[in-house]
A protein has these predicted regions:
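Membrane-interface junctions at the ends of membrane-embedded or membrane-associated helices
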Residues: 89-95, 136-144
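Juxtamembrane/membrane-water interface recognition
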Residues: 24, 123, 136-137
Length: 153
C-alpha cells in the first residue's frame, strides 16, 4: 500500500493535472486560427471557477457549511468543475472523467481531507450550475462531431 505522503502527492496533483489538460484543450484551436473557440473554452473554465470560488467566499463570509457542522470542499468543487469541462470538451471520455472524480473523492475520504457529508453537500450545490454551464456552452465548445444545437431560451 502507498504511504500517506505518496497518496497526498497524488491527491495534490489531481486538480492541477485536470486544469492543465483544460488549458491545453482550450488553446488547442489557436494554431488553426480559431480564436473564438479558444476564447469560449477559456470562458467556460473561468466561469465554472468563479462559481466554485464564489461559493467558497460566500461560505467564508456567511459560515454556511460551519453552521451545519461541515466544511465546504473547494477541492471537490474545483474537481467537479474540471470534470464537467473535460466531459464537455472530450465527451467520449466522460465515463473516464467521472470515474476519476469518484476515485478522487474516495482518496479524499481515505486521506481524511473531508467527510462524505462535506463532499456530498458541496457536490449538491456546485454540480447543478456547473452542469448547466457545460450544457449551455457545449454547442459552442465541443468537438465538431459532438456539437448539439444551442438550447432555445
Amino acid at each position: 500500500m502507498l504511504d500517506y505522503e505518496t497518496l497526498d502527492a497524488i491527491a495534490d496533483a489531481y486538480t492541477p493535472l485536470l486544469g492543465g489538460l483544460w488549458l491545453l484543450l482550450a488553446v488547442s484551436p489557436l494554431p488553426r486560427g480559431q480564436w473564438r473557440l479558444a476564447a469560449l473554452r477559456i470562458a467556460l473554465g473561468l466561469t465554472t471557477l468563479v462559481v466554485c470560488y464564489g461559493l467558497m467566499f460566500a461560505d467564508k463570509a456567511l459560515g454556511i457549511w460551519p453552521a451545519l457542522g461541515l466544511d465546504y470542499s473547494t477541492h471537490s468543487a474545483v474537481a467537479i468543475a474540471a470534470v464537467g469541462i473535460l466531459g464537455t470538451l472530450l465527451p467520449r471520455l466522460r465515463p473516464t472523467w467521472i470515474a476519476s472524480l469518484l476515485a478522487y473523492f474516495a482518496l479524499m475520504l481515505y486521506q481524511r481531507y473531508h467527510s462524505l457529508a462535506d463532499i456530498a453537500t458541496t457536490a449538491a450545490v456546485i454540480a447543478p450550475p456547473v452542469v448547466w454551464l457545460c450544457m449551455r456552452f457545449a454547442p459552442h465548445v465541443a468537438p465538431i462531431g459532438h456539437r448539439q444545437p444551442a438550447p432555445q431560451p
